[in-house]
Structures are given as C-alpha cells and as structure tokens.
Amino acid sequence: MSQPPINPLGQPQVPAAASPSGQPSVVKRLKTSSTGLFKRFITVPDKYPKMRYVYDTGIIALAAIAILSILLTASGNSLMLYALAPALALGALGVTLLISDILDSPKAKKIGEAITAIVVPIIVLAIAAGLIAGAFVASSGTMLVFANPMFVMGLITVGLYFMSLNKLTLDYFRREHLLRMEKKTQETAEPILVTPSADDAKKIAVEKKKDLSASARMEEHEASQRQDARHRRIGREAQGSFFYSSRNPEHRRSFGSLSRFKTKPSDAASTRPASISPPFKDDFQPYHFKDLRSSSFGSGASSAFTPIMPASSRSPNFSTGTVLHPEPVYPKGGKEPSIPRVSSSSRRSPRDRQDKQQQQQNQDEEQKQQSKKKSGKSNQSLKTPPPDGKSTANLSPSNPFSDGYDEREKRKHRKNK
C-alpha cells in the first residue's frame, strides 16, 4: 500500500521568499545577544583554561601600576594615598588567583592554600609597615606624622592585616582541624558500621517481608494458651478452687473464663495433705477443703482459702485462714467419725489467735499428763495379780481398750465402805 502524496491537489510547493531586509549588523547581534560583553569577557577563562594565567597576571600588573602611580603622584603628602587600599586589595586578589590556578593537582592546591593563608597577611602587614615608615620619613619624625595620609593609610592597612589573618589564616587552620577530626571519626566508625554479609542481608529482607500483624496475633494466641495451661495446672495441683477471668475482651471472647477445676478423689487424696481418710471405714470418702468450703461447716464460697503450712511434731500449727479441731478416733462399731470442724478466723485479731494457740498447747500438755498417769497405773495393775487369780487382763466389753483398772478400783471402794 502506497503512502498518500504530501500534496494531494498536485500543486507544486513554492519555497518561502527571502526576507527583503539584509543580514543583521554586529551592533544588533550584540544588542540582541543573551549574554553581555562584560559577561563574555569574564567567562573567557572558563572556555579557555590557559587564559586564567593571563588574567591573573593582568590583575597583578594593574595593581602594581596603580600603587606606583599613586606614590609618585602624591609624593607622600596628598589625599591620593587613600587609593592605595583598593590597589593593594586588587594585587592580593591577583596573587591568590595565580597561585590557585598554577596548582592543578589536589595536593598542589592544598599546598597553595597553605601558602596563600600564610603569605597574604604577611604581605599586607609589610605594606602597612612601609606606609607608616614613609609617613615618618616625610614628616621628619615630628608630630605632623599623625596628619600625614600615609600614616592613616598604614593604620587602615593594619586593619586589613587583621581581617586577612582572620579570614584566611585562621579559617584555613580551622578547616584543616575539622577535616582531621572527620577523618579520625570515619576511621573509628568504619569497623563498627560494616556492610552486612549475604546471610544478614537475606535475614533483613525476610524480616521486612514478614507480616507484623499476623505474627503479633500468633504471639498473643500462644501467650493466652500458655496462660490457660498454667491456670489448669495450678487448679490441679492447688488445695482449693480458683476462678479466673481475663480482662482482655478478645481473650474472653476466644477462650472464655475458666470454670472451677475438678479433680478425681483418688488423685486429690494422694496429693493433697488436707484430706482425712480413716483406715477403719471402707465406705468412708475423704473430706477435702474444697468440699468443706461449699458445705455448711465452711466459711462460704466467698471466703479466701489459704493453704495449710507444715506443722511441727510438738503442737499442731494450722494456717490463719482455717482452724482444724481434732476429733477422737473411735473403733469400728462404736461412735461414727465426725466431720472435722472448720471455722473461719479471718476476722480474728492476732491476740485472739495467740490466745487460741496457748489454750491448745495447755490442752495438749494436760492430755499428755493424763496419759502418763494412766500408763503408770496400768503398769502397777499389771504387776499385781488380779483378785480372781486369773492372769489375763479383764477387758470391759464397753471399752475394749481398758484393762479393768477402773472396775477394780470401784470394787475396792465398795468393800471399804
């Protein structure tokens, strides 16, 4: 498929007619140019680097011509001596530019900057000294030296010396000190700020791609599971029931509050020291403090349960939360074993507890003394033969643990009457 013609009407293309006006002159080009003549003159060294030396040398030459012409024209007594200040500044600028252009390498530039920072203030001070000395020579050492313009220019040049000393020399030394400190800091921090290895970079990339919200939810779920298992273990091993409810609504919604923990009677009887199971009753079930808390003998479900502390062999030492009163043990067929009485002493004062413990110790001592007396009498009765001539012990059917001592005493008392 051929392309359509550029001119579909078939008309020949007529070239544009040339402008009747002639070529623009040099003056018009300069006027319409985007850059001025002075700017082009200044930017010549940028286009041609070798022209820098020409410019620097020209600046120094102009400064020298200005200084010499001023000194010759003024003859040391004219106000034209005040023009020495800009001429001297122009000469110092030319010397500085020439030194910086000659030295191309970084090391050479560093040396040139050091020379400039040290030499320029010395040159300015020498000029000031020359001006002051010329003023003294012109005034023949009289008081007219203070009215001489050369002396005033010397004082102004001394001010320029201090300015150059501050701006060139001191700034150069400050910059060098900062560069040395920066280099020392980089050398010190380079071993610490090392680039990560390939494995470390891979781990960092994996950590960046990880879903932080999902990992946080997983950690929270695992923490709640560990807490739930810990409370279950405490409920199995502890001596009472525990109620737990989380303050976190999400945890409560996910797992719910923990109910009362229940254990088997066999496990509780073997692990808990609070269980009491006499060996003479086959169908007797051990009583646990968990059951006593809910029964009429306990202090109610609202009272706090305190685990029993180990007691000494001399006297029972129960916890302050509950007091356990011992009951006598009866043989099979006699009096039924009673449930241990549990009373709450959470509202008792420490003095009442001490009185109760003292009373308990006194009762224990009285029981021990009575048991010693009974054992002594039983030994005497065993040594003396019974009155009926039999050597066997006369056991009472009502009390199988008695040796008949009380019955014999009653008979003796009746005979004496």
Swiss-Prot record:
Q: What is this protein called?
A: Uncharacterized protein CPn_0443/CP_0310/CPj0443/CpB0459
Q: Where is this region: Disordered?
A: 1-24, 211-283, 308-417
Keywords annotated in UniProt: Cell membrane, Membrane, Transmembrane, Transmembrane helix
Question: What coarse category fits the chief subcellular location reported for this protein?
Answer: membrane
The protein's matches in InterPro entries, at most eight in alphabetical order, are given as:
DUF5423 (IPR035355), MFS_trans_sf (IPR036259)
Compositionally biased residues, Basic and acidic residues: 211-228
Biased composition regions of type Low complexity, renumbered to the chain = 336-347
Q: How does it sit in the membrane?
A: Multi-pass membrane protein
Name the family the entry cites.
Belongs to the chlamydial CPn_0443/CT_005/TC_0273 family.
Q: Which organism is it from?
A: Chlamydia pneumoniae (Chlamydophila pneumoniae)
- Residue ranges annotated as compositionally biased, kind Polar residues, are 312-322, 391-401
